[in-house]
Amino acid sequence: MDEADWNFTEQQAETVFTCEQLRDTQGVKPHSEIVLDLFFLPIEGEEARREAFEKALSSFGYELGEAEKDEEVAASIGPIPFTPQDIWLHEERTTKMALARGFRPDGWGFAEPDN
């Protein structure tokens, strides 16, 4: 799978929807400072180049984290403002890195902001 096969428009719409839901139902304030956690899984049937993916993430300032599943890659960045635009910037960038190395996004999250 490469960028041409991925639906970035749908992914961005889901990010905007999720941010709106978190704002409206959980009271997360726009522009709250968050540390964004991003999760990735290998693409079935493709060679997942984990070391290359982790190196790419690190070179862009993402901290590698503990993943819940052995095959999963977890990365964090922040603090960043809680806005759909800021989250999407990182989600799109890391998705492109992932797809080029045999991984796909598997969601994002963050710890509840202090304010």
Per-range role (PLM):
Residues M1-N115:
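Long, contiguous binding/interaction regions
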